[in-house]
Swiss-Prot record:
<feature type="signal peptide">
    <location>
        <begin position="1"/>
        <end position="34"/>
    </location>
</feature>
<feature type="binding site">
    <location>
        <begin position="166"/>
        <end position="167"/>
    </location>
    <ligand>
        <name>substrate</name>
    </ligand>
</feature>
<dbReference type="InterPro" id="IPR012341">
    <property type="entry name" value="6hp_glycosidase-like_sf"/>
</dbReference>
<feature type="binding site">
    <location>
        <begin position="284"/>
        <end position="286"/>
    </location>
    <ligand>
        <name>substrate</name>
    </ligand>
</feature>
<dbReference type="GO" id="GO:0071474">
    <property type="term" value="P:cellular hyperosmotic response"/>
</dbReference>
<feature type="binding site">
    <location>
        <begin position="212"/>
        <end position="214"/>
    </location>
    <ligand>
        <name>substrate</name>
    </ligand>
</feature>
<dbReference type="GO" id="GO:0004555">
    <property type="term" value="F:alpha,alpha-trehalase activity"/>
</dbReference>
<dbReference type="GO" id="GO:0005993">
    <property type="term" value="P:trehalose catabolic process"/>
</dbReference>
<feature type="active site" description="Proton donor/acceptor">
    <location>
        <position position="319"/>
    </location>
</feature>
<dbReference type="InterPro" id="IPR008928">
    <property type="entry name" value="6-hairpin_glycosidase_sf"/>
</dbReference>
<feature type="binding site">
    <location>
        <position position="317"/>
    </location>
    <ligand>
        <name>substrate</name>
    </ligand>
</feature>
<dbReference type="Pfam" id="PF01204">
    <property type="entry name" value="Trehalase"/>
</dbReference>
<keyword id="KW-0574">Periplasm</keyword>
<dbReference type="InterPro" id="IPR023720">
    <property type="entry name" value="Trehalase_periplasmic"/>
</dbReference>
<feature type="active site" description="Proton donor/acceptor">
    <location>
        <position position="503"/>
    </location>
</feature>
<feature type="region of interest" description="Disordered">
    <location>
        <begin position="544"/>
        <end position="570"/>
    </location>
</feature>
<dbReference type="InterPro" id="IPR018232">
    <property type="entry name" value="Glyco_hydro_37_CS"/>
</dbReference>
Length: 570
C-alpha cells in the first residue's frame, strides 16, 4: 500500500499499479495461499512478495552462485518504487539486470575469512571464535529481510549471517561451557522476544523464515539458563513457553480423529502428535531456483504441494534427507507433511515437562498437573505409534499409509534424550545405533546414501550430542563414549589439517568435512563449536581439563547434570 503522504507523478503511479499487478499475477501462479501483504501490516513481508516479478527474474537469471545472496540483499529505496522502475526499464534496449540490481540494492558483504592465530589448541580456537561469530541487529534498514533483535547473538558462520533456532541451543552449550552466561541469557531473551513478536520462534531472523519454525529447543534453552539462574529463569519465561506450545498445538481443539491442522495431527485412536509445517507453499526465497527445478522434475504432483513439503523439511532442520522421501534419489518425492517425526514429538514432550516444572515454580499446581498429563499422554502416543516393534527402534509415523516407517535414523535417539523411552526399548535402540549408524568418525544421520546432506555418510554435531546424552541417560555408557570419542577425533583431525571447525563431517572416516546438499560446506561453525567444547569437558576430568582431544580413548565420560527421569525409565 502506498502511503498517502507520498505524492508521485501520474506516470509513476500508473507504473506502480502495473508493478503491483505483475506481483499479484506472479504469485497467483505459485500459490493461492501466499500471504497477503495488506492482511497484517505488523508482519514484514519476505523479498519474494515485496519484489514480485523482479525477485523471480533475478533468481531465475542466476546472477549469484548462492540464491540466498539476493534474498538477503537490502533495497536502497521503497521496493514499490524499485519495482515500478524495473517494469519501465526491463524491456528497453540494452537493459542490464545485474547493473539494475547493483544500483538499487546493497548486497550482503562477503564474510571476512577468519585467520586464527598460529599454534592454537582446539579449545583456544573455539573460545577465540565466539566474538567473531557475535552479531547485533538492534537497528536494521527499513526493507532489510533481517529481523531486528534486542540483544546480541551468535550466528553459525559462513553463509548463515543470522541466528537460527535449533542451532542456537547447541551453540549456547558451548557459550555456557566458556563461562559466557551473559551471552546465553541474551540469546534466550532474543528468542523470548521473537515469541512475543511473532507468536513463535521463526526458522531464523529473516522475513522469509517467518512462515515456519524449527525443532523446538526453547525449553532446553530455558532449562540451561536455569542451571545458572535457578527457577527464576523458568518463572520469567513461562509466558513464552506457553505461547510456543500454543503455536505448535494450534487447532487441536477442533480436530476429529484422522484429521490434521497445520502442525498438529490427531490419529484414528485419538492420540495427538505433531508434524512439521510451513504456512506458505511457494518456492523458498533462499533456494528459489532449486525449488522450482525440483517441482518441475515431478509433473505428477502439484508444485505447491512439493513447495510446502520442501519448506516443511527446512522447518525440521533436516533439509534434506531420505527420511522425508518416497524415493531417496528423487527429492521431488518428498512428503514431509505426511510424516509424524519422532524427534519433534520427543522435543514437545520435553516442552510439556518444562511447562509443568515452570508452572510448579510459579506456584500454579493445577497448571503443573495439566502439563504433566499432556506429557504423559504424548509419551504413551510415542510408545504406541512411534516405536517399530519389528525393527526394534523408534521411527517416524507415516500418515499417508497409516503405519510406522522402517527407516532407522539418528532421530531414534531423541526419546532417550528426553527420558521418554522405556528401558528395554532404549537398550534396543542403543544396539541398533551401534550396529547400523556408528561409524569411525561418529554417528551417521541415516544409513542411506542419497546425496542429501542429512543422510550417510554425514554426521552432525547436534545429533552426536543428542545420541551421547540419550545413551548416558539409560546407562549405555560405552556406546555413548564411542559416539563422543569418534566424533571428537573426527573434529580434531579436521582441525589439525585445516585449522577450522565445519558444519558437518563425513563420519565414514576421520578428518573430512561432510558434503551433499544445496550449498558448499560451511565453516564456523556454531553448533559444532558448542558440542565440541561440551564433549571435551566430558571426556576429561574437571580437575584436569583438556584443550585438545587426547590421543587415547578415556575409560568413561565425566558425569553430566542429572535429568529427572520419566516414569518410563523406572
Amino acid at each position: 500500500m502506498i502511503p498517502p503522504e507520498i505524492r508521485r507523478s501520474v506516470l509513476l503511479q500508473k507504473a506502480i499499479k502495473l508493478a503491483l499487478a505483475g506481483t499479484l499475477l506472479t504469485f497467483a501462479s505459485f500459490s493461492a495461499t501466499a500471504a497477503d501483504p495488506s492482511s497484517d501490516t505488523e508482519t514484514p513481508q519476505p523479498p519474494d512478495i515485496l519484489l514480485g516479478p523482479l525477485f523471480n527474474d533475478v533468481q531465475n537469471a542466476k546472477l549469484f552462485p548462492d540464491q540466498k545472496t539476493f534474498a538477503d540483499a537490502i533495497p536502497n529505496s521503497d521496493p514499490l518504487m524499485i519495482l515500478a522502475d524495473y517494469r519501465m526499464q526491463r524491456n528497453q534496449s540494452g537493459f542490464d539486470l545485474r547493473h539494475f540490481v547493483d544500483v538499487n540494492f546493497t548486497l550482503p558483504k562477503a564474510g571476512e575469512k577468519y585467520v586464527p592465530p598460529a599454534g592454537q589448541s582446539l579449545r583456544e580456537h573455539i573460545d577465540g571464535l565466539w566474538p567473531v561469530l557475535t552479531r547485533s541487529t538492534k537497528n536494521v534498514e527499513k526493507w532489510d529481510s533481517l529481523l531486528p533483535l534486542p540483544e546480541s547473538y551468535v550466528v553459525p558462520g559462513g553463509r548463515f549471517r543470522e541466528i537460527y533456532y535449533w542451532d542456537s541451543y547447541f551453540t549456547m552449550l558451548g557459550l555456557a561451557e566458556s563461562g559466557h552466561w551473559d551471552k546465553v541469557a541474551d540469546m534466550v531473551a532474543n528468542f523470548g522476544y521473537e515469541i512475543d513478536a511473532w507468536g513463535h520462534i521463526p526458522n531464523g531472523n529473516r522475513t522469509y523464515y517467518l512462515s515456519r519454525s524449527q525443532p523446538p529447543f526453547f525449553a532446553f534453552m530455558v532449562e540451561l539458563l536455569a542451571q545458572h539462574e535457578g527457577d527464576d529463569a523458568l518463572k520469567e519465561y513461562l509466558p513464552q513457553l506457553q505461547k510456543e506450545y500454543a503455536y505448535w498445538m494450534e487447532g487441536v481443539e477442533t480436530l476429529q480423529p484422522g484429521q490434521q491442522n497445520q502442525r498438529v495431527v490427531k490419529l484414528e485412536d485419538g492420540s495427538v502428535l505433531n508434524r512439521y509445517w510451513d504456512d506458505r507453499d511457494t518456492p523458498r526465497p533462499e533456494s528459489w531456483v532449486e525449488d522450482i527445478a525440483t517441482a518441475k522434475s515431478n509433473p505428477n504432483r502439484p508444485a505447491t504441494e512439493i513447495y510446502r513439503d520442501l519448506r516443511s523439511a527446512a522447518a525440521s532442520g533436516w533439509d534434506f534427507s531420505s527420511r522425508w522421501m518416497d524415493n531417496p534419489q528423487q527429492l521431488s518425492t518428498i512428503r514431509t507433511t505426511t510424516i509424524v517425526p519422532v524427534d519433534l514429538n520427543a522435543l514437545l514432550y520435553q516442552l510439556e515437562k518444562t511447562l509443568a516444572r515452570a508452572s510448579a515454580a510459579a506456584g500454579d499446581r493445577a497448571k503443573a498437573s495439566h502439563y504433566d498429563a499432556l506429557a504423559n499422554a504424548r509419551q504413551q502416543a510415542i510408545e504406541m505409534h512411534l516405536w517399530n516393534n519389528k525393527e526394534g527402534w523408534y521411527a517416524d509415523y507415516d500418515l499417508k499409509n497409516n503405519k510406522i516407517r522402517d527407516q532407522l535414523t539418528a532421530a531414534a535417539l531423541f526419546p532417550l534424550y528426553v527420558n521418554a523411552a522405556a528401558k528395554d526399548r532404549a537398550a534396543k535402540v542403543a544396539a541398533a545405533a551401534q550396529a547400523h549408524l556408528l561409524q569411525p568418525g561418529g554417528l551417521a544421520t541415516t544409513s542411506v546414501k542419497s546425496g542429501q546432506q542429512w543422510d550417510a555418510p554425514n554426521g552432525w554435531a547436534p545429533l552426536q550430542w543428542v545420541a551421547a546424552e540419550g545413551l548416558q541417560n539409560y546407562g549405555q555408557d560405552d556406546v555413548a563414549m564411542e559416539v563422543t570419542w569418534r566424533f571428537l577425533t573426527n573434529v580434531q583431525h579436521t582441525y589439525d589439517r585445516e585449522k577450522k571447525l565445519v558444519e558437518k563431517y563425513d563420519v565414514s572416516s576421520t578428518g573430512t568435512g561432510g558434503g551433499g546438499g544445496e550449498y558448499p560446506l560451511q565453516d564456523g561453525f556454531g553448533w559444532t563449536n558448542g558440542v565440541t567444547l561440551k564433549m571435551l569437558d566430558l571426556i576429561c576430568p574437571q580437575e584436569k581439563p583438556c584443550d585438545s582431544v587426547p590421543s587415547t580413548r578415556p575409560a568413561s565420560l565425566s558425569a553430566t547434570p542429572t535429568k529427572t527421569p520419566s516414569a518410563a525409565t523406572q
